[in-house]
């Protein structure tokens, strides 16, 4: 009878715990990424909106139609959702629509404060230095900024996505790819201003890597 709600991904390989997913009798999927391979099989419910700015936007929309006022997000939860929207839209500058701002307004009504949300993005000196090193290592390839690096400190892995975001602010950069060694694997963060479909590129890269040589 347990319901497992998977948010911000539809792929089995990207969930936090495959064991929990497999043990739950019912699964609901809430995601905004373009549908590709590896979709979770036979979900009881799917909320899939590729044109939505973020999974946080979708969750906020759903919460407005569920339960009574007491069931709505508290201030901390609302600020977490607003942080998700701000992260995926780069502070409402990318991939935004009318529904994005309506969701943000709803979260504001639930008590979210942008000042406190902004503080959630503060970084340590270790994280900042790791991000700076990744940005400095980037090279240009066909209007794409590409950075490849060895391992970064485990506590600074958030710098991988942050570096990919920062590379988009460089003139003439339409997409960014930051690849960092993590143990025996590679963590890749890809970002785009819209002209380059980085999700398709990443999917093709995974297919190529998995093919026998």
Residue ranges of predicted features:
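Hydrophobic helix-and-loop "lid/oligomerization" segment in the mid-to-C-terminal part
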Residues: 1, 87-210
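Short alpha-helices
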Residues: 32-105
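Hydrophobic/aromatic beta-strand patches that form the interior of the parallel beta-sheet core
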Residues: 5, 26-30, 45-48, 145, ...
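Short glycine-rich anion-binding loops that position phosphate/pyrophosphate groups of nucleotides
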Residues: 9-12, 33-35, 152
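A generic local secondary-structure boundary/capping motif
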Residues: 16-19, 46-50, 71, 136, ...
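N-terminal small/polar loop signature for handling phosphorylated ligands or for N-terminal nucleophile
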Residues: 1-23
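Short, structured coil segments at secondary-structure junctions
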Residues: 22-24, 40-43, 205
